[in-house]
């Protein structure tokens, strides 16, 4: 039996709260069950040096966990003086996912940075961050349009992500921490609205998974992400 008696294809309750903080152009608190991530989108009227004069914009992301987001306190990475490899991997993943739904030329020579801060972690922090960051990004870009800064909408749709895995020989969707800790296979799937994949990160822990199991996990991810798209649409309609 899964935690909270969920079915194998059932995601946790997901809540998206827009305009969560005052100053960011886009601000979202996303909750995947007990996992909570604050996603703030900030706009700068400049681009990184490697894009100077290229007539296009940039979307990037930063990711971090508050010291007491987990069961015991973790030292801030700023205090350590460097980011962990995990942190760098996750923020690059978030940025790639977001760029998949933005026409960078239509964005113009400006940068949107999404800061994803994990307030509380109970599995699936990177997938929650991507799903929430997409809504924050939408709000930031809609503000540029409303302010008359952009004449053409650079948004190409929604992007969302979910974790899937094999736990006790069962394929399951949206893993909580207790499931993730004992999963034989752990996979993160990022998808855009038309069903195309942006990224698939899958790893076997101890026992390899079969081609059939891979397809089963991708099918579960497709079901879960389509539910997330609906949550995003409802949030953006409010």
Swiss-Prot record:
Keywords: Nucleotidyltransferase, RNA-binding, rRNA processing, Transferase, tRNA processing, tRNA-binding. Its EC number is 2.7.7.56. It catalyses: tRNA(n+1) + phosphate = tRNA(n) + a ribonucleoside 5'-diphosphate. InterPro entries: ExoRNase_PH_dom1, ExoRNase_PH_dom2, ExoRNase_PH_dom2_sf, PNPase/RNase_PH_dom_sf, Ribosomal_Su5_D2-typ_SF, RNase_PH, RNase_PH_bac-type, RNase_PH_CS. Belongs to the RNase PH family. GO terms for molecular function: 3'-5'-RNA exonuclease activity; tRNA binding; tRNA nucleotidyltransferase activity. It is an enzyme of class 2 (transferase). This is Ribonuclease PH. It comes from Haemophilus ducreyi (strain 35000HP / ATCC 700724). PANTHER family: EXOSOME COMPLEX COMPONENT, EXOSOME COMPLEX COMPONENT RRP41. Homohexameric ring arranged as a trimer of dimers. It comes from the Bacteria. Phosphate binds at residues 86, 124-126.
């Amino acid at each position: 039996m899964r935690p909270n008696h969920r079915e194998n294809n059932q995601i946790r309750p997901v809540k998206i709260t827009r305009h969560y903080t005052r100053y960011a152009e886009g601000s979202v608190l996303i909750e995947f069950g007990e996992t909570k991530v604050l996603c703030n989108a900030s706009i700068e009227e400049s681009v990184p040096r490697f894009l100077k004069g290229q007539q296009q914009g940039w979307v990037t992301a930063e990711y971090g966990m508050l010291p007491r987001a987990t069961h015991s306190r973790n030292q801030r990475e700023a205090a350590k003086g460097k980011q962990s490899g995990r942190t760098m991997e996750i923020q690059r993943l978030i940025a790639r996912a977001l760029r998949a739904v933005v026409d960078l030329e239509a964005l113009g020579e400006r940068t949107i940075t999404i800061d994803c801060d994990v307030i509380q972690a109970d599995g699936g922090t990177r997938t929650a961050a991507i799903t929430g960051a997409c809504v924050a990004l939408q709000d930031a870009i809609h503000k540029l349009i409303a302010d008359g800064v952009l004449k053409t909408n650079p948004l190409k749709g929604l992007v969302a992500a979910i974790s899937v895995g094999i736990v006790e020989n069962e394929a399951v969707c949206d893993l909580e921490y207790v499931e993730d800790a004992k999963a034989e296979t752990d996979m993160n799937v990022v998808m855009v609205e038309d069903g195309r994949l942006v990224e698939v990160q899958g790893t076997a822990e101890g026992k390899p998974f079969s081609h059939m199991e891979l397809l089963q996990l991708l099918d579960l991810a497709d079901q879960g992400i389509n539910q997330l798209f609906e949550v995003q649409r409802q949030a953006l309609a409010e």
